[in-house]
């Protein structure tokens, strides 16, 4: 609770949300979706960040009676109308700006039978490109493609007051106690706004090639200036 941006000290079993690990200046170091189940907190971080988040949390244990370990779980994401899940499935709802989403956490050695059970219940398999299209529509960032080392939480609208849904806490709790980076969050929220924000850019298809992640966005006209950069395409 004292390390991440989400309020977790009174989280009940079944609670799901997101959380951020910030540096002292309020810049985002790690993002994770989380689930509380049977006395454990499951943090789902992007694979390139999992080990560094694990290392940080391990260093912060001190005298606390807690064990931190990497699991052998994989995540299956269901989008669209709900279907019946296997009885032993560990799942969490994820509120975002796209289609209804349920993440199912599955032991790696149970992946194939779980997929078969979901298909039997009506799910259809789709690849990463299909998921990425839904993620972009939902304004859900990929930390490596859409954000950078200067990103602060208010740059992602869904992290602060999750898209106007009062039942979903987003990734930042604005009324919890101190945590690293909180001063930046409070200052931006109460006194101003982020100088940058994640936005959806529509491409009209008139150019023969697509832009690449990292390409600059510029204003048109004689005195063009850089106003942003391309993320996920």
Feature locations, PLM:
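Basic, glycine/lysine-rich polyanion-binding surfaces/domains
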Residues: 1-233
């Amino acid at each position: 609770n004292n390390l991440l941006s989400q309020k977790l000290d009174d989280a009940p079993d079944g609670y799901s949300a997101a959380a951020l690990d910030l540096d002292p200046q309020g810049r985002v170091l790690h993002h994770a979706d989380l689930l509380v189940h049977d006395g454990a907190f499951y943090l789902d971080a992007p694979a390139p960040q999992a080990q560094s988040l694990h290392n940080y949390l391990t260093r912060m244990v001190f005298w606390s009676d807690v064990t931190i370990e990497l699991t052998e779980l994989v995540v299956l994401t269901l989008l669209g109308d709900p279907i019946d899940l296997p009885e032993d499935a560990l799942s969490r709802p994820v509120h975002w700006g796209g289609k209804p989403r349920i993440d199912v956490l599955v032991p790696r050695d149970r992946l194939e039978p779980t997929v078969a059970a979901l298909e039997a219940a009506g799910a259809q398999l789709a690849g990463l490109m299909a998921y990425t299209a839904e993620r972009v529509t939902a304004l859900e960032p990929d930390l490596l493609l859409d954000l950078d080392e200067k990103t602060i939480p208010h740059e992602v609208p869904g992290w602060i007051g999750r898209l106007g849904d009062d039942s979903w806490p987003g990734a930042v709790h604005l009324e919890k106690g101190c945590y690293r980076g909180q001063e930046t969050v409070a200052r931006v929220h109460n006194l101003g706004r982020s100088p940058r924000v994640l936005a959806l850019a529509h491409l009209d298809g008139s150019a023969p090639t697509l832009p690449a992640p990292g390409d600059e966005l510029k204003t048109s006209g004689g005195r063009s200036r850089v106003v942003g950069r391309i993320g996920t395409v």
